[in-house]
Regions:
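Positively charged, helix-rich recognition surfaces that bind polyanionic ligands
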Residues: 4-15, 19-270
Length: 270
């Protein structure tokens, strides 16, 4: 039958499909529409390199830095406490179900904080730059478990696990996804380049060596003496790699297909 929902945005165009979903005890409705739009032209003509990291969420080649929000890290103790309380309850009992809902709501809050901050960051970058060059990072491979198997146990498992958590907490994949569709909508482009040695290469002379990286934040070339913030140097190398790709006449793409059909996704709380 019919039901009411909060119309958070005006629905425009021809409705193609409607999806109703539930998350953490709340119901959502997503409405996909199709409408004719003119080819967008990006208001900017600048090109920028973006270096994604853990200590800094994103560093641009022009020196702009976006600090991480670390929503999971800030709620880690509370999440652990709720999970301990869950383990003490009888499985599938009413109290167990209530405690499980509390954990789900906290997970949802952590994800919403991260997603909201990423939207603010990607909107700022997308509005100011027509072309964004990023590293073609394989996040799933970077965050794989190091535990190994019984016959071949992994090494430095605790250290690798400690690195995996902040990598996933930053939401690099989601940041890339948002940049791609926002650039598509605004007439800009996203170019993904190989990430190899961007943190070790000197953006001034091109000398590549692991000794150039003095620390997490300091970079000093052992040949020409060029010094800079390590993340800014990496972003400039990413930008230079993007220029090299364009100079070779290769097709500009982000590495994954983008749906060309103009759509609008509207989500409202039931």
């Amino acid at each position: 039958g019919w039901m009411r929902y909060r119309n958070s945005r005006q629905v425009t165009g021809v409705v193609k499909n409607v999806t109703v979903s539930q998350s953490s005890g709340k119901w959502y409705i997503s409405i996909q529409t199709e409408s004719e739009v003119s080819t967008p032209v990006h208001p900017s003509a600048s090109m920028v390199g973006l270096d994604a990291g853990v200590a800094k969420l994103a560093t641009l080649s022009d020196g702009t830095v976006f600090e991480p929000v670390n929503s999971l890290q800030k709620n880690q103790k509370k999440l652990a406490r709720l999970q301990r309380q869950l383990s003490r309850k009888v499985k599938f009992s009413n109290n167990w179900q209530k405690q499980k809902c509390k954990i789900q709501r906290l997970h949802s809050r952590i994800a919403n904080i991260r997603r909201d901050y990423l939207h603010k960051v990607t909107t700022t970058v997308s509005k100011n730059h027509a072309m964004i060059v990023i590293e073609d990072l394989k996040v799933s491979n970077m965050s794989k478990s190091a535990a190994g198997t019984v016959s071949q146990p992994g090494r430095n498992v605790r250290a690798k696990s400690g690195l995996n958590r902040p990598i996933l907490d930053q939401g690099w994949y989601e940041m890339r996804r948002q940049l791609e569709y926002k650039q598509l909508w605004s007439g800009g482009q996203v170019l993904a380049v190989p990430p190899a040695y961007t943190s070790q290469r000197c953006a001034c002379c091109g000398h590549t060596a692991k000794e150039n990286r003095l620390s997490q934040s300091k970079f000093r070339c052992q040949v020409c003496g060029y010094t800079a913030n390590a993340d800014v140097n990496g972003a400039r190398n990413i930008l230079a790699a993007g220029h090299a790709v364009l100079a070779c006449g290769e097709m500009v793409q982000s590495g994954r297909p983008l749906k060309q059909e103009p759509t609008e996704m509207i989500q409202a709380t039931a």
